[in-house]
């Protein structure tokens, strides 16, 4: 059985709806293989909830107008499509949006049962004039990907007064990825996969990635079932990159190194603290233009984080180091 470095996955949270996931080290070429598979799965196969049809009292079709309502039915349908819904109910169900009098009709005015949440409650659905009455039923279902209004119409929603809606089930808004070179031990040709995931408020990015991973495991498992004893690559334990140590994911830009030391390391392809720990002092000194003072500087910075170079004794004494070196 071939043994490979075990990749680690670290989440860098950008906001409540956006995270950056770093997976490394991956065998050469696997960054693009995994990145493309995850991106496609995230955009097309994550379950979500959406409105499939609406029924507005007194309205027979989407080209109607409603007395006392600023928006026509077509505009209301467009607003309904922007609803962000999370649902724990597997079967189709109907909710009601009822409001009277002058003012805005908001998404948070929808009467939802337990297990249903509206993620963008401030979304304006319609604007009412004085004495106007707005009474709308919304049918909500769970699904995946995108289903057109025409498809919803063909699926049995052509009853009088029922207006089908384009259903955007996917809770994932945007996914991008890039692949960089990274180091593992003495090899520098491994892949680092960086995936940027932005979701709707109905799901956390980490949950979306977990769902995509589960889906891919199920699909790839079909191939494995052909011969469960077939030889493959086994991922060993990579002691260089403990998942619990966030310090190892600190970019070298954040270490406060001198310009000379920083430039030498970047030219060598070193980007994170975890990669520095794969070097011995002599290996650093072998880098072009990287002298003893640069090596001492790096050891001092690592010691501040509680780490040391490969083969070095922890607790580097940097008391003699000149902090103005290389500036």
UniProtKB/Swiss-Prot annotation:
This is DNA-directed RNA polymerase subunit alpha. Homodimer. The RNAP catalytic core consists of 2 alpha, 1 beta, 1 beta' and 1 omega subunit. When a sigma factor is associated with the core the holoenzyme is formed, which can initiate transcription. Residues 1-227 are annotated as: Alpha N-terminal domain (alpha-NTD). Gene3D superfamilies: 5' to 3' exonuclease, C-terminal subdomain, DNA-directed RNA polymerase, insert domain, RNA polymerase, RBP11-like subunit. It is an enzyme of class 2 (transferase). The gene is rpoA. DNA-dependent RNA polymerase catalyzes the transcription of DNA into RNA using the four ribonucleoside triphosphates as substrates. Residues 244-327 are annotated as: Alpha C-terminal domain (alpha-CTD). It catalyses: RNA(n) + a ribonucleoside 5'-triphosphate = RNA(n+1) + diphosphate. One of its GO terms (cellular component) is DNA-directed RNA polymerase complex. HAMAP family: RNApol_bact_RpoA. Keywords: DNA-directed RNA polymerase, Nucleotidyltransferase, Transcription, Transferase. Belongs to the RNA polymerase alpha chain family. The keyword Transferase applies. One of its GO terms (biological process) is DNA-templated transcription. Its EC number is 2.7.7.6. The N-terminal domain is essential for RNAP assembly and basal transcription, whereas the C-terminal domain is involved in interaction with transcriptional regulators and with upstream promoter elements. GO terms for molecular function: DNA binding; DNA-directed RNA polymerase activity; protein dimerization activity. Pfam families: RNA_pol_A_bac, RNA_pol_A_CTD, RNA_pol_L. It comes from Tropheryma whipplei (strain Twist).
